[in-house]
């Protein structure tokens, strides 16, 4: 099975922010770095044929053309005014669908429908609810995927964390899989750091683990500064950087180190 492309810029997915943030207090949003006047001046003009301009998906600074009715997802352009990016009715894994660009721009629920909801009814919405929208992902918690290449690792991280949160603390201490252990520690530390007043995390490292709990050979830092973070190559069994490899912005071509050893 081919290696899943590693993340270049991925903060924390919504379920992680909710679950880990709750452990240390109210979850704090992760914000993109501010756009400087210099960066905004470099933005190309929106095409004249664009009926509506909107903020970009991700931590970029340049406006894009909003999507009409049709396909959408976490890393696509935002839906036009009055539309909301939602998983299709009956989708068993709505968050998965949105990260794969398999949602749809639909008319947003009317205010009247929202007001007629029984206030006494229990709240049943969860991070995997069918009501999960692109707006909740990108606005409420500032969860930004800067390109379609980030999405496989996003879903990979969701799968890893879903298995983690079902375990007791004593089970976690018994883990032998190095990447899975490190990922849990990193997420726990990030959740605590986000509680500190005035702190703004614009770069950090989120381990890229495979389904067996070891490392993918390509690892990248998360960047919320509108450009890809650095990527490097590691040994899958230890996560240690491969001797002779260099950190680059983009694909470090990790396969070359393993091919040379054959």
Swiss-Prot record:
Just give the chief location class: secreted
Q: Which residues carry this modification: Phosphotyrosine?
A: 161
- The Thyroglobulin type-1 domain is annotated at 176-254
| Cystine connections | 32-59, 35-61, 43-62, 50-65, 72-85, 79-105, 179-209, 220-231, 233-254
- Annotated spans, Disordered: 101-133
Answer whether the UniProt record assigns the keyword Phosphoprotein to this protein: yes
GO cellular component terms given for this protein: extracellular space
User: Which keywords label this protein?
Assistant: Disulfide bond, Growth factor binding, Phosphoprotein, Secreted, Signal
Entries under PROSITE patterns matching the protein? IGFBP_N_2, THYROGLOBULIN_1_1, THYROGLOBULIN_1_2
- Keyword hit for Phosphoprotein: yes
Molecular function GO terms recorded: insulin-like growth factor I binding; insulin-like growth factor II binding
Q: IGFBP N-terminal domain spans which residues?
A: 28-108
In the record, which positions carry Phosphoserine? 126, 129, 147, 245
- State where the protein is found: Secreted
Please give the subunit comment from the record: Binds equally well IGF1 and IGF2. Interacts with integrin ITGA5:ITGB1. Interacts with VHL; this interaction inhibits HIF1A degradation.
Q: What does this protein do?
A: Multifunctional protein that plays a critical role in regulating the availability of IGFs such as IGF1 and IGF2 to their receptors and thereby regulates IGF-mediated cellular processes including cell migration, proliferation, differentiation or apoptosis in a cell-type specific manner. Also plays a positive role in cell migration by interacting with integrin ITGA5:ITGB1 through its RGD motif. Mechanistically, binding to integrins leads to activation of focal adhesion kinase/PTK2 and stimulation of the mitogen-activated protein kinase (MAPK) pathway.
Q: What is this protein called?
A: Insulin-like growth factor-binding protein 1
